[in-house]
Amino acid sequence: MQKLTEQSPEFIRAIAPYKAGKPVSDVVRELGLDPNTVVKLASNENPLGLGEKAKAAIAQAAMDLGRYPDANGFALKAKLAARHGVKPEQITLGNGSNDVLELAAKAFLTQGTNAVFSQYAFAVYPLATQGCGAQSKVVPAVCFTHDLDGFLKAIDTQTHVVFIANPNNPTGTFLPQEKLLAFLKQVPSHVLVVLDEAYNEFLKPEDQYDSTQWVSQFPNLLVSRSFS
């Protein structure tokens, strides 16, 4: 008799579970440490805790927890659109940027297609690609950063998505806007370029750029940001 798990696609069964940043409570329990002596740096978390304005906003929002929230995020999209100078209908919300990355993969990848990303890429890229049954085309890094010329050579007729983290996670390397724009101009229009800017706010002032304005120039560009 066939096992229930054998009925799922082979590419799903081959996925190794994603290992998120270990909670401090787990480290304390496993190693018998004082929680006040443990410093966690792995998950981009604020060690200072919630600010007073955030606490007040949460308390106010708690008054409406008996109701489902607006599934389309109308108010949040309106404020984000005003902040970034785009239209609300250009914004997609997710449960963290991981959710947006996975939605992009599910929307554009399937068996017989492929996604291109760097040798040192965010762990979610290969997982999201494999979860759709697509092939991962991994481009060797140059000095721990993205080789955009290598990306262009790797793109073929079956490439549907290119993932680029800038600044890159986990290497911390950065591509200036001139290189990104030159790359975008050469990417075929059938390929979705996902520009993952989860660490955008960490850039030096002289390195900062506004990629949200590029989406009007490149219809195949998706810019991902994160509140974390």
Q: Where does each model-flagged region fall?
A:
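Glycine/Thr-rich phosphate-binding loops of Rossmann-like dinucleotide-binding domains
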Residues: 49-51, 101-104, 125-126, 171-172, ...
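Active-site pre-lysine segment of PLP-dependent enzymes
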Residues: 148-158, 170-193, 197-228
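Short acidic capping loops at alpha-helix termini that bridge into adjacent secondary structure
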Residues: 36-37, 87-91, 111-114, 158, ...
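PLP-dependent aminotransferase-like
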Residues: 107-164
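Short, structured coil segments at secondary-structure junctions
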Residues: 87, 132-133, 217-218
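Short glycine-rich anion-binding loops that position phosphate/pyrophosphate groups of nucleotides
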Residues: 44-46, 97-98, 122, 166-170, ...
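Short hydrophobic alpha-helical segments of the AMP-binding
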Residues: 80, 125, 129, 187
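N-terminal small-domain helix-loop-helix segment of the aminotransferase-like
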Residues: 2-96, 103
